[in-house]
Amino acid sequence: MSNENNNLSLYGWSDNLFRQKQISQYKDMSHGRIIVTHKTCYEVVAEDGVYLCELTGNMIYGRVPDEYPCTGDWVIFQPFDANKGIIVDILPRERALYRKKNGRVADRQAIASYVDKAFIVQSLDDNFNVRRAERFIAQVMEEKIKPVLVLNKADLGCDRQKIDEAIKHIARQFPVFITSIRQPQTILRLRESITKGETVVFVGSSGVGKSSLVNALCGKSVLNTSDISLSTGKGRHTSTRREMVLMDGSGVLIDTPGVREFGLAIDNPDSLTEMFEISDYAESCRFSDCKHIDEPGCAVLEAVHNGTLDHKVYESYLKLRREAWHFSASEHEKRKKEKSFTKLVEEVKKRKANF
């Protein structure tokens, strides 16, 4: 761990975070931001260096897994023994990106917090999948994070007309960048879109070049990358942890491991209408609570039938809506159980205090 002076405002520290810290019972202790999440510990950048921190027992056993710290969280910790510490509190999360864990249970996994933008990275080869891009965008918008589609490895050659046609409904709503680390001007345009103090998380499948993009944006090698496989022409999975790096004179970048599946953790399925431009037509539906599935007088269905709304986009909306509905229903039931668990924990604490 390093000993250095860090300007935490470059990492996003603000007056609002300071006020939140004053509410904590641990307000007189050190604070910092988690820059790397390991399996059982965390690297926390503070004003006087980087600390390797663990959690207190109360935090481990008094919280559900999706409330454990994640990369990007601002935490309060007690330093000890030369750049080591114990995390005692987490400041309230904002703009946290989650995904549904694999499996049938509605468990969420926190990927990163205090995120301003999400760079949704796909490579212009066999990895390109507009339906997968829509899935990432849906989750990002749920958390009030700005989605940006980054189509990487443009040097591989692709049918640009076909790509443009596939993403036109995305490009009408969100920024789209075509990039290649072998084409510096494309990296420059992407870098110019990141402002000072802004936090950007990179998400996407394995081998799309997320770590290489982070290195290119920083102008130096800050993350490990792998060579291209000669047999497949694809990058190998490199990132194994969620890691934050600071750009010189600009924002904060968070690299994440590639994912094979990205399950939706959306509480309100109705929010999907905004992403798919369905809300543009929904205003003309006969019923204000129309779900745009089989209701009479549905302007959305009419737009699909007359070709104004792409039927593939509409089918994607239905699929994601069903998935979001199942998650929200399961999440509601799970939260009732968690409330009972929280009451039990508080009761145990009270009993201990009385002994």
UniProtKB/Swiss-Prot annotation:
Belongs to the TRAFAC class YlqF/YawG GTPase family. RsgA subfamily. Monomer. Associates with 30S ribosomal subunit, binds 16S rRNA. Its main location: cytoplasm. Its cofactor is Zn(2+). One of several proteins that assist in the late maturation steps of the functional core of the 30S ribosomal subunit. Helps release RbfA from mature subunits. May play a role in the assembly of ribosomal proteins into the subunit. Circularly permuted GTPase that catalyzes slow GTP hydrolysis, GTPase activity is stimulated by the 30S ribosomal subunit. Binds 1 zinc ion per subunit. This is Small ribosomal subunit biogenesis GTPase RsgA 1. GTP binds at N152, K153, A154, D155, G204, S205, S206, G207, V208, G209, K210, S211, S212. It is found in: Cytoplasm. The gene is rsgA1. Its EC number is 3.6.1.-. Zn(2+) binds at C285, C290, H292, C298. NCBIfam families: ribosome small subunit-dependent GTPase A (TIGR00157). Transmembrane segments: none annotated. GO terms for biological process: ribosomal small subunit biogenesis. Keywords: Cytoplasm, GTP-binding, Hydrolase, Metal-binding, Nucleotide-binding, Ribosome biogenesis, RNA-binding, rRNA-binding, Zinc.
